[in-house]
Amino acid sequence: MYKKSLTIAAVLGALTLNVGAWDYEGHHAINELALASLPADFGGFALTPAFKNRVAFLGGEPDRWRNVGDLPLRHFNGPDHYIDLEDLKLYGLTPETLPLMRYDLVADIARERVAHPDKFPPIDPAKDADHTRELSGFLPWAITEYYEKLKSCFSYLKTFQKYGGTPEEIANAQANVVYVMGVMGHFVGDGSQPLHTTMHFNGWVGDNPHGYTTSLKFHQWIDGGYFRQTGGINVGKLAGKIHPAERIKNAGQPDGMFRDAVSYIVEQNKLVGPLYALDKEGKLTGEGDKGLEGRVFLDGQLVKAGQMLGDIWYTAWLEAPEDQYLEKQLQGRNAAPAGTEKK
């Protein structure tokens, strides 16, 4: 969950979670909330308790990838968890003009750094072992790409179901759907945490006219400490605020889901200042009546993430086409004479 040098603990939780926020417990809760939004026929197969438990567990998976500390994985995984929207102006971009393809953004960054090196502070190689300091994060691309992966999973699942896939093939396709659902939930959850959308991700940096905290423990407090202080996450209570999943209207457009992901992140970025203000006003201490007032804000962010995630899952199911290549393969296989080996 944390950006760059921050780390996370991943521990098991139950329905009423007693530790963490957007630590493992928060991501577990967000995936549970998203599951609560789905219709009974979602996916064309039964989301059994075992499947649901796996979806919830996988909400913490991208943070578990930090456990080995290998630089190639850190380089690949770390920037997917955030985007510093303030950096866009350095590249002549706005949220509305972000390119659909992540590596087009990398090219934009590289061109601007070569053309205008004076705009960018020097990078200390000792603090850039994973070579991510030149990047501003890929969170909306990660969300979009996982949506497309889920569409692909549903595509071949539908085709196996309709054109005579074996029970083993169908079961494996269902398991793949569950895996991608769970993992992508992590990134949608990160998008609801305002500190994952900003350069002020762990204490205010630079000009600070409002006197906001500069504590290097602030991110950790919002991710987990405050919820531990205030009794944990009650998923059952928050689920009452979730409405049935809805199809994302523009998802059928080539850049529709990406633009929706960007808009979702921009809306959370607008809450960076209010979040810091809650801290300054003493509403995030977790002590006394005043210190509990920030709980409504953070609970609301979990609900936003769960709702967005449910809508994305539902849309992927509805938008997924049948896999035409697989259809032909299955039809040919099933038309083969008895005794012919099926491949």
Language model features by range: what are they?
Residues 1-7:
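Bacterial N-terminal signal peptides that target proteins for export
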Residues 10-13:
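Hydrophobic helical h-region of N-terminal Sec-dependent signal peptides
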Residues 16-18:
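N-terminal signal peptide c-region/cleavage motif recognized by signal peptidases
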